[in-house]
């Protein structure tokens, strides 16, 4: 199976297909620590990372931001003392796209 963390996001336009349940299930083993949440009817991937202090959390936040700029796909990020919560979804299609799965895997890879 193709590694998500080695893929590149594609340009996503309004009307692009949502990730199917089968596609999401097929890649769950590569992003096992991510939860699927539904907020205001929109599915998103969410994960909270733990750190020893605020400085480490902020440094990780900046790395996620740099990754988002490189890929042209941007998450919601909440940074607090000792933790960072990252949520990926695709605003244009109001749900999960393959790009979100890719970015979840790439976010995890920042800590490898």
Swiss-Prot record:
The record's keywords, sorted A to Z, are: Lyase
Report the EC number(s), separated by commas if there are several.
Answer: 4.2.1.96
| Parts of the chain that traverse the membrane | none
Q: Does the keyword DNA-binding apply?
A: no
> What EC class does the entry list?
lyase
Known catalysed reaction(s)?
(4aS,6R)-4a-hydroxy-L-erythro-5,6,7,8-tetrahydrobiopterin = (6R)-L-erythro-6,7-dihydrobiopterin + H2O
Which terms in the Gene Ontology molecular function aspect does this entry carry? 4-alpha-hydroxytetrahydrobiopterin dehydratase activity
Single GO biological process annotation from the record? tetrahydrobiopterin biosynthetic process
**Similarity annotation:** Belongs to the pterin-4-alpha-carbinolamine dehydratase family.
Which HAMAP family does the entry mention?
Answer: Pterin_4_alpha (MF_00434)
Q: By its UniProt entry, which PANTHER family does this protein fall under?
A: PTERIN-4-ALPHA-CARBINOLAMINE DEHYDRATASE-RELATED
Q: What is this protein called?
A: Putative pterin-4-alpha-carbinolamine dehydratase
Q: Whose protein is this, by species? A: Syntrophotalea carbinolica (strain DSM 2380 / NBRC 103641 / GraBd1) (Pelobacter carbinolicus)
